[in-house]
Structure formats: structure tokens, C-alpha cells
């Protein structure tokens, strides 16, 4: 690790330690996404099979009745693909909007923390002014990844339509196809995230528009590939450290695993994500100074 990376890691740690309020947007974002996801899922379930939630909550049916109801639920899902699609897209748009608002907030907050003092209200006011360009970027990102999901969705729908008449060879085909497409999607999503690493920072820190922010972010990446790869590895190690910390809880069964997951999520929101965001902000600040600015667009 070079001296510059060491300085960045130290600066991020000190900024978070002096300004623990940097964790607030991450916590609020996480809770908001969970709430929206649950609300969207329950709305879809209730629209497709209104009697299902009440039946599950009553708990007055056995395994066989549950299997029958679940089978009926799958049939109704296949008959309401359009409704599920609209609900899913609506949920994605809401999540993208939340990501844009909170991401602008925490980037500005971490930037201010590195400067010396982070104030929630000041950073939030700045975030609101940049919501539109960052929201457009989040929609572009969501659209790119969403389009890549279409073959996998079609594969899953085809599987459920033919589930009662599948041969062993056909089942093996679906399993292999699913694994291949899942691997492709994972690689594609990681590649897109990597290429657009610095775009949110360009929009929030340099006050760029959506397109000029994309150009600026890609340019910073192109001139700093090695540093970016190293930073991604360091961020990945920080995430792995959370998993290691939560691993001992697994020895206590289901509830222990659940508690360990909860601890890892909370530590991620409160410490790891603010610190690693400070790292990215500091890296962007240092590396973008040498580049010519693009006009807003």
C-alpha cells in the first residue's frame, strides 16, 4: 500500500471519528429501503391473493394446506405478470429516488467531515439541490442493470409455466442456464458499478449535471485505474471484516445467525459505510484536481 492510500485511510477514519453524524444518512437510507421493499412486496401479494396474508397470520392450516395455497399463489403470479412488472418497476423507481437523495446527502456530509465539520442540515440542503441530476444517473444505472435481468426473468417464467411437465434433462437445462445468466449478471453489475465509480462524486462535489458527471467520473477512473482497483479491494476487505465479526453468532443456531446479521448490518451503516465513503471522497478530491472540468450539462 502506497503512502497516499495510507493517508486516505487515515483521513477517512479521522473524519468519521470526529463526525459520527456521517452515519445518519446511511441508517435512514437503509431503513427507508427496507420499509419501501416490504410495502411493495405486501402490496403485490395482497393484490394477487388478498386472502393469503390473513391465512398466514392466522396460522390455522398445516403443511399440506400451505403447499396448496402456495401453488395457487404461483399460478396467480403467472396470471398477473403485468401487475407484478408494474409493481416491481414502481419499487425500483422509488428505491432509485431514495438512493439519489441519501447518496448526495452522505457524500456531501463526508466531504464536509474531511474538511473539518459536518452539519446534517447543511449537507441535506446541498443534497436536495442535486437530487435531479443524481436521480437521472440512478435511473440510467437501474435501467442498464434491469435490461440485463430480462433474459433471467424470462427463464424463470418459462420454468414455472412448465414446472409440472419438466423432464430431468429440461430441469438440468434450466439450472445450468440460470447459473450462467446469474454469473453474467453479477459480472455485468460489478463492471457497471466499477465504470461509474466516481460519477456520484463528480455530481455532488464538482456540481456536475448528469451527462457531464458521467464524463467526469469516467475520466477520473481512466486516469486512476490502479488506485481505484486498490480502493475497491480495501472496501471489499472492510465488508469481509463485518462478515468475520458476525460469523461466531452462527454457532447459536437460527436466532444467533439472525442476530449476527443484524449486528453486521448496523455496524455497516454506522461505521463501515461512512468510513469507506470518506475514503472514496478523499480519493476523488485528490485525483480530480489534476483534471480539467467539463461544463455542467
From Swiss-Prot:
<dbReference type="GO" id="GO:0005886">
    <property type="term" value="C:plasma membrane"/>
</dbReference>
<protein>
    <recommendedName>
        <fullName>Uncharacterized protein AF_0863</fullName>
    </recommendedName>
</protein>
<feature type="transmembrane region" description="Helical">
    <location>
        <begin position="185"/>
        <end position="205"/>
    </location>
</feature>
<feature type="transmembrane region" description="Helical">
    <location>
        <begin position="262"/>
        <end position="284"/>
    </location>
</feature>
<keyword id="KW-0472">Membrane</keyword>
<keyword id="KW-1003">Cell membrane</keyword>
<dbReference type="InterPro" id="IPR057169">
    <property type="entry name" value="DUF7847"/>
</dbReference>
<feature type="transmembrane region" description="Helical">
    <location>
        <begin position="134"/>
        <end position="156"/>
    </location>
</feature>
<feature type="transmembrane region" description="Helical">
    <location>
        <begin position="80"/>
        <end position="102"/>
    </location>
</feature>
<feature type="transmembrane region" description="Helical">
    <location>
        <begin position="225"/>
        <end position="247"/>
    </location>
</feature>
<feature type="transmembrane region" description="Helical">
    <location>
        <begin position="26"/>
        <end position="48"/>
    </location>
</feature>
<keyword id="KW-1133">Transmembrane helix</keyword>
<keyword id="KW-0812">Transmembrane</keyword>
<dbReference type="Pfam" id="PF25231">
    <property type="entry name" value="DUF7847"/>
</dbReference>
Amino acid at each position: 500500500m502506497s503512502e497516499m492510500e495510507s493517508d486516505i485511510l487515515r483521513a477517512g477514519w479521522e473524519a468519521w471519528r470526529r463526525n459520527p453524524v456521517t452515519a445518519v444518512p446511511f441508517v435512514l437510507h437503509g431503513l427507508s429501503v427496507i420499509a419501501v421493499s416490504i410495502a411493495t412486496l405486501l402490496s403485490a401479494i395482497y393484490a394477487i391473493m388478498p386472502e393469503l396474508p390473513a391465512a398466514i397470520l392466522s396460522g390455522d392450516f398445516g403443511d399440506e394446506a400451505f403447499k396448496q395455497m402456495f401453488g395457487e399463489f404461483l399460478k396467480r403470479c403467472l396470471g398477473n405478470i403485468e401487475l407484478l412488472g408494474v409493481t416491481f418497476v414502481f419499487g425500483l423507481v422509488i428505491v432509485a429516488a431514495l438512493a439519489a437523495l441519501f447518496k448526495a446527502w452522505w457524500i456531501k456530509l463526508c466531504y464536509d467531515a474531511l474538511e473539518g465539520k459536518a452539519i446534517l442540515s447543511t449537507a441535506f440542503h446541498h443534497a436536495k439541490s442535486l437530487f435531479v441530476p443524481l436521480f437521472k444517473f440512478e435511473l440510467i444505472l437501474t435501467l442498464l442493470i434491469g435490461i440485463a435481468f430480462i433474459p433471467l426473468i424470462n427463464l424463470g417464467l418459462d420454468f414455472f409455466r412448465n414446472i409440472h411437465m419438466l423432464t430431468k434433462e429440461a430441469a438440468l437445462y434450466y439450472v445450468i442456464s440460470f447459473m450462467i445468466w446469474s454469473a453474467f449478471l453479477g459480472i455485468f453489475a460489478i463492471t457497471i458499478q466499477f465504470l461509474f465509480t466516481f460519477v456520484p462524486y463528480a455530481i455532488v462535489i464538482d456540481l456536475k449535471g448528469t451527462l457531464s458527471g458521467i464524463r467526469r467520473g469516467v475520466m477520473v477512473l481512466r486516469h486512476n485505474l490502479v488506485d481505484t482497483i486498490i480502493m475497491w479491494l480495501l472496501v471489499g476487505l472492510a465488508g469481509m471484516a463485518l462478515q468475520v465479526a458476525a460469523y461466531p453468532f452462527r454457532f447459536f443456531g437460527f436466532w444467533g445467525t439472525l442476530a449476527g446479521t443484524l449486528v453486521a448490518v448496523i455496524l455497516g451503516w454506522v461505521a463501515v459505510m461512512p468510513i469507506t465513503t470518506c475514503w472514496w471522497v478523499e480519493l476523488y478530491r485528490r485525483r480530480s484536481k489534476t483534471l480539467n472540468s467539463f461544463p455542467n450539462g
